[in-house]
């Protein structure tokens, strides 16, 4: 078992912050988080591209290359692998592994579960040490906690997750799942660690831990809050008010580039 996989079996769930660039990743790691993920929305929006449209393959790989040698465990949000061809997804995953990533997040987008399972199997064959977090979008795109059409309910969710487990997934991810009873039911049926997306309106971290959740991702929340803080700061200044909140100093932000400069100097 890898160090990253071990974090999914510790006493407390893995709380995974999601970064969108070098500075955000290094700042989070500096606060003691042993692993940092990326957010596909943050990466896409920063590049002026849409999320979930397979448009950010190069941007995602570029960020992985910048972060893979840093002193934290890196997991990459790769949307659906940027292709419907399992071999192409596997090759991209192999490149992430070579770059230094230890995990990959692959979402099914409510597409054919057999196709997604084939992607997972191909990735595990190409990069056996890469932790594959298989995401199903039954709750994210399927209408929330049950909408009567087979999506957003436990039966369809479990059907997909069991198929992904059989294909070799190391963990499974159900964003949008917040109802404690449904979380508890899934945990009892799964053989791999369950990952959920943190929601300010959902259960708190201690409650999720009690339910058996093993990984809690922040997704795009940090990126969206950073955008909100920037706008609020400018609005306050324009209104003659002193901006509130914590602001890193110029020197603190500048210091975040030193690991990269040091790596390049000795590379």
What are these regions (language model features)?
Residues 7-24, 49-57, 74-88, 131-156, ...:
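Active-site mouth loops of central-metabolism enzymes
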Residues 50-76, 99, 112-135, 178-203:
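Alpha-helix-loop-beta-strand connector modules within alpha/beta enzyme cores
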């Amino acid at each position: 078992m890898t160090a990253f996989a071990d974090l999914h079996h510790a006493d407390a769930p893995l709380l995974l912050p999601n970064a969108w660039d070098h500075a955000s990743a290094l700042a989070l790691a500096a606060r003691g988080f042993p692993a940092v993920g990326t957010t596909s929305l943050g990466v896409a929006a920063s590049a002026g591209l849409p999320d979930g449209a397979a448009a950010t393959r190069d941007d995602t790989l570029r960020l992985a290359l910048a972060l893979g040698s840093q002193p934290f465990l890196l997991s990459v949000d790769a949307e659906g692998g940027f292709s419907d061809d399992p071999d192409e997804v596997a090759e991209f995953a192999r490149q992430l592994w070579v770059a230094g990533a230890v995990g990959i997040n692959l979402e099914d987008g409510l597409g054919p579960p057999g196709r997604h399972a084939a992607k997972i199997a191909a990735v595990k064959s190409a990069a056996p040490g890469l932790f594959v977090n298989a995401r199903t979008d039954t709750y994210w795109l399927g209408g929330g906690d049950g909408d009567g059409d087979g999506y957003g309910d436990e039966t369809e969710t479990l059907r997909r997750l069991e198929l992904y487990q059989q294909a070799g997934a190391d963990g499974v991810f159900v964003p949008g799942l917040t109802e404690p009873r449904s979380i508890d039911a899934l945990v009892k049926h799964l053989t791999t660690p369950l990952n959920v997306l943190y929601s300010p309106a959902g259960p708190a971290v201690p409650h999720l831990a009690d339910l058996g959740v093993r990984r809690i991702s922040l997704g795009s929340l940090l990126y969206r809050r950073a955008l909100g803080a920037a706008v609020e700061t400018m609005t306050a200044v324009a209104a003659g008010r002193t901006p509130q909140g914590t602001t890193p100093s110029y020197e603190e932000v500048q210091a975040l580039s030193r690991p990269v400069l040091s790596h390049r100097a000795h590379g």
